[in-house]
Amino acid sequence: KVEVIVSTLNDFQALALLEALKKVGHTKVSLLGGDTIKTTDMSKGAGLVEGVYATSPILEAKEFTTGRPFLEKYQAAFKKAPAYGGHYTYDSMYVLSAAIQNAKSADPKEITKALRTINGYAPVIGTMTWDEKGEQRYGAVGVYELRGGNWELRMRSDRW
């Protein structure tokens, strides 16, 4: 008996799968996917099966202490919500600026060297740091559940 489907599908593919499962009466199953299903379009899949879950390395701005003020200021300035993951871009600009200042150069190689040694201030998520290979240190993955048409955080890998 299948209880969980682990998927690498995109949202539109996952929705088609959920609709097909409902059509054949196989709804006592949960779908687990990645951030490719953690979209607003997936809200159409709420209630088609017992559960829909997604993991994502992109935590929402509202999940950070300073996230709500960022969202309020952005909404006031641009009259719409930021793009998915936009707070990471916002924070990255602060870190990049600090790296350019530390490198005292606009040379990409010097900036890259500086980025690998920086503990950069990031206004929304706190800090951004990278290892010698360029991988972000201390990143977190969120586990989300689709409930009532909205994605709700269930747990974070940095707080198991």
What kind of region is each of these model predictions?
Residues K1-W160:
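Extracytosolic ligand-binding ectodomains
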